[in-house]
Amino acid sequence: MAYHPVYNETMSMGGGSSNEFGQWLDKQLVPFDTSSGSLRVELLHGNLDIWVKEAKHLPNMDGFHNTLVGGMFFGLGRRNHKVDGENSSKITSDPYVTVSISGAVIGRTFVISNSENPVWMQHFDVPVAHSAAKVHFVVKDSDIIGSQIIGAVEIPTEQLCSGNRIEGLFPILNSRGKPCKQGAVLSLSIQYIPMERMRLYQKGVGFGVECVGVPGTYFPLRKGGRVTLYQDAHVDDGTLPSVHLDGGIQYRHGKCWEDMADAIRRARRLIYITGWSVFHPVRLVRRNNDPTQGTLGELLKVKSQEGVRVLVLVWDDPTSRSLLGFSTKGLMNTSDEETRRFFKHSSVQVLLCPRYGGKGHSFIKKSEVETIYTHHQKTMIVDAEAAQNRRKIVAFVGGLDLCNGRFDTPKHPLFRTLKTIHKDDFHNPNFVTTADDGPREPWHDLHSKIDGPAAYDVLANFEERWMKASKPRGIGRLRTSSDDSLLRLDRIPDIMGLSEASSANDNDPESWHVQVFRSIDSSSVKGFPKDPKEATGRNLLCGKNILIDMSIHAAYVKAIRSAQHFIYIENQYFLGSSFNWDSNKNLGANNLIPMEIALKIANKIRAREKFAAYIVIPMWPEGAPTSNPIQRILYWQHKTMQMMYQTIYKALVEVGLDGQLEPQDFLNFFCLGTREVGTREVPDGTVSVYNSPRKPPQLNAAQVQALKSRRFMIYVHSKGMVVDDEFVLIGSANINQRSLEGTRDTEIAMGGYQPHHSWAKKGSRPRGQIFGYRMSLWAEHLGFLEQEFEEPENMECVRRVRQLSELNWRQYAAEEVTEMPGHLLKYPVQVDRTGKVSSLPGYETFPDLGGKIIGSFLVVEENLTI
């Protein structure tokens, strides 16, 4: 057989079942092309409405394998998320179909066991933002390890652009362009619906009381709630400028960790916590350096002694160990074993939860999942006081883990607080330094509190995860399991149920509509259906031997497509849409977010409408910026930026504006950094001149440079987005494949808006809580507020913010050490008028620590870096 590698197929961020949004990753080399001649490449930006109905007369792909091994593996792993076919007693093919475009899989049917005439009748409504000549339907036979390609059907995108539905029986062709078996056909239908025909995206993100939120998700939109938005772990009164909202209200800056500590103290029934890391010695309240406030561990022990059910679900780092009194911290330094030991003889129940692979996964796939990926959700659920002496559920969701290194304020000190509020809480894993010398790594993050019906969905997520994690495994399965750790709220009359939980009605101008989203699969939760045919009704996607909830990605795509004025993003990572890069297209970083933003801007340019996107990321991912993994991530980040800017430049050329405007008039990337002159707070409240207690020869080179320059990046750990000052999305998910795929890191997020503070409701710019939050973040980053900042889509605002960030970068990079009133830095790359992204002259590497800013293509495990 002649093999002609024409495309790699990797799972994109598309749909499955009847879900509108969501996808997963899968790599596969399809070694043939079923068409002859070249076809025109078309940009498909909109949705593909697809039905994969049935196949007939498929060949028996299993006969050879079972003859070869004597059927020794027959039945092993064949019943996991599969449907029995018409030949359940016969050994034959276990077919399923993948749908792909630009080498990225956008849909997958469930597997039907032992069938040469499978019937799926499976619907996909898939968002696409791909340039391609063909859509591929690949029919495969699922094996115990991997799969075999039976054949493929190709639909030219040029035909789809006519807008007509293409449907019928299509021959399944092999590598020679011939039927894989006489009479073998696939019944399907497909229609392309371009963005301009989709009314869902034309009214803004939160267009009023009748909005249904993100359709086709596991958790629906919940109405009648309240939300508190947080920036950083703490904001001292009077440290940020006032922001005035509609109705004469002044925006109130929340104090996240103090609110969480207060919620713990006031809990009467339950405290449930999930985290990537939870560290018991952390102090949530640090006013006046008061040691009587107690640690997190002490607070939880006290509450458990009062009869409150305290459950803590933490990721079990596979590199940390505790055996016979000896322990290792682990590569990620999450302190999981230390936290478990602290609570061991208390009534606080701590469950260390490994990231398990799916039941039907191969040994290699399981090993990858269990060693590379994590449980990354950060939530706290408590009962709180409600009306009429009853209790209700309140949930905290966001990017802040309750562990060391996370407590910070908008001032983001480097040295001054090492002996006060950051005493015993020093964190800087970027190079070798100490709490005596510094600098600490400043930490910027976003978090939220949900009061209302959506909090019960956060509770449901915890319960589903706890039930799965507490299920006995290995030899423990021989014992009877009766874990009753979770409270049955339906048996506690004083706790309101979901139907009673609305904390505000739609007539209240301060009410919220809130929706909970996740990235998670059936290997991490209990409660997903066993039968994949039932996944459709639960808005779950079908992977191979696994069901997937990918609603965080769906929420991002929905919000970006609905944006009318601007997008503001803060995220720890920003990479994706590799299918549209100029190289490395088959990497598998297939989330749509970067391409959707670029196409949103391009469409606004063609319509000659105002629009801007502001994206804040860390200067570099946490760790040594010279290391191979971080250089590789920075390389992918550079490829993502390049793709976006070139897409925008092409739109400017198309409308003849390339001589007047440039891509950075619409899209800008920023990072955060700060400097301090040589002073430090001391415990008695005074400030003294600070000199390192040790001589420079005793310090490493990076530490010497950092102490001399007295500067460091502010680490952006945020995972949030504001759209048009009317919609906010905050959670634990990064903008990369790990967080958005659903089968890698487990994540959770909330999306919300105030229906009375929307463009549709007001007919003008909303000035509700989300407007106040965005302005407060800008005040933190820029050091002050100007009137131009109220309208981010205006060119005057874009250029003013860029100008200030460039001035801040020059101050950050200068030899002279000066206090920085603002922290927002222009990301240190050069973007020319044609959209080419290159090194900034004179700043090819990061100050002090080195490492190429645009990254390097160094050898490292791919799935670690995307």
UniProtKB/Swiss-Prot annotation:
Q: What is its EC number?
A: 3.1.4.4
Cofactor(s) this protein cannot do without? Ca(2+)
Keywords, A to Z, come to: Calcium, Cytoplasm, Hydrolase, Lipid degradation, Lipid metabolism, Membrane, Metal-binding, Phosphoprotein, Repeat
Cellular component GO terms, alphabetical: cytoplasm; membrane
Give the top-rank taxon of the lineage listed in the UniProt record for this protein: Eukaryota
Q: What induces it, per record? A: Activated by wounding, heavy metal, methyl salicylate, osmotic and salt stresses.
Q: What does it do?
A: Hydrolyzes glycerol-phospholipids at the terminal phosphodiesteric bond to generate phosphatidic acids (PA). Plays an important role in various cellular processes, including phytohormone action, vesicular trafficking, secretion, cytoskeletal arrangement, meiosis, tumor promotion, pathogenesis, membrane deterioration and senescence. Can use phosphatidylserine but prefers ethanolamine-containing lipids as substrates.
Q: Which topology term describes how it sits in the membrane?
A: Peripheral membrane protein
Name under which the protein is recorded: Phospholipase D gamma 3
Cellular localization per UniProt: Cytoplasm; Membrane
For binding a 1,2-diacyl-sn-glycero-3-phosphate, which residues are annotated in this chain's numbering?
376, 572, 717
Domain named PLD phosphodiesterase: which ranges? Answer: 371-406, 712-739
What UniProt notes about the protein's domains is: C2 domain is a calcium-binding fold, and the binding promotes the protein association with membranes. In PLD gamma, all the calcium-coordinating acidic amino acids are conserved.
GO biological process terms, semicolon-separated = lipid catabolic process; phosphatidylcholine metabolic process
Which chemical reaction does it catalyze?
a 1,2-diacyl-sn-glycero-3-phosphocholine + H2O = a 1,2-diacyl-sn-glycero-3-phosphate + choline + H(+)
Which CDD domains does the entry link to?
A: C2_plant_PLD
Q: What positions does the domain C2 occupy? A: 31-170
Q: What is its main location?
A: cytoplasm
